[in-house]
């Protein structure tokens, strides 16, 4: 699978399998099936309430851990330096792993600076390979980049063919080559994206 190189040299698969809104009790099997068809990036979050099931899938698969890129996100109730550090340890336990490939701050509210400092320190300690944010607009991204010593590797935001956010892309590149990662790149299947004639023709000619 194609990868992108983050600004700290870590390789991230271009395509990830997100586990948001998978019904309780079905996440383990969904992740195993995703891995079986070739996905190597699994994206979860503390607020999804399914980290433990993702961990069960990672424990059950025969694919080595170092071949799987694992993302989770810190929820608002765990913001602040100490709370974030403690929540990462809890996520590691649920996910049955001793390191995380990418950890993001899920929303741009609350004590983002204290939380990001905690992620940076955990990155230095080797428990996280890459750190970043999610749902930060250009102004909030500029704040976190300007007032933190550690570089931001990723900003995961909503991007799809109907909402391309070209200015955000340019701004992220200017802020230390932060990678913009799309959530819901297929617009959650809405707006006729899979039957759109222009998009269908584009796929035919790729």
Predicted regions, residues:
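N-terminal binding-site loop/beta-alpha segment at the start of enzyme catalytic domains
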Residues: 1-68, 186
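Conserved, mostly hydrophobic/aromatic
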Residues: 17, 42, 54, 70, ...
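Active-site-proximal loop/turn and secondary-structure-junction residues that shape catalytic pockets
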Residues: 21, 46-48, 74-76, 109, ...
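Glycine/proline-rich, positively charged
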Residues: 79-153, 157-160, 178
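Charged helix-capping and loop-helix junction motifs
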Residues: 85-88, 113-118, 169-170, 192-200
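His/Asp/Glu-enriched short active-site or ligand-binding loop at hydrolase and phosphoryl-transfer sites
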Residues: 156-161, 177-192
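Anionic-ligand binding region
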Residues: 165-173
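Conserved small/polar residues in nucleotide/adenosyl-binding loops
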Residues: 204-206
């Amino acid at each position: 699978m194609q990868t992108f190189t983050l600004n700290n040299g870590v390789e991230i698969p271009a395509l990830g399998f997100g586990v948001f809104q998978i019904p309780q009790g079905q996440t383990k099997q969904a992740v195993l099936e995703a891995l079986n068809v070739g996905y190597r990036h699994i994206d979860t979050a503390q607020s999804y309430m399914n980290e433990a099931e993702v961990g069960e899938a990672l424990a059950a698969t025969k694919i080595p851990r170092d071949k799987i890129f694992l993302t989770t996100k810190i929820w608002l109730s765990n913001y602040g330096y100490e709370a974030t550090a403690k929540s990462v340890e809890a996520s590691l336990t649920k996910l049955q792993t001793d390191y995380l490939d990418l950890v993001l701050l899920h929303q741009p509210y609350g004590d983002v600076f204290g939380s990001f400092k905690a992620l940076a320190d955990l990155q230095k300690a080797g428990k996280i390979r890459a750190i970043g944010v999610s749902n930060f607009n250009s102004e909030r991204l500029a704040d976190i980049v300007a007032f933190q010593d550690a570089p931001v590797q990723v900003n995961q935001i909503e991007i799809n063919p109907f909402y391309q956010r070209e200015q955000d892309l340019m701004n992220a590149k200017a802020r230390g080559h932060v990678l913009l990662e799309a959530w819901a790149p297929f617009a959650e299947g809405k707006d006729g994206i899979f039957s759109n004639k222009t998009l269908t023709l584009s796929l035919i000619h790729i």
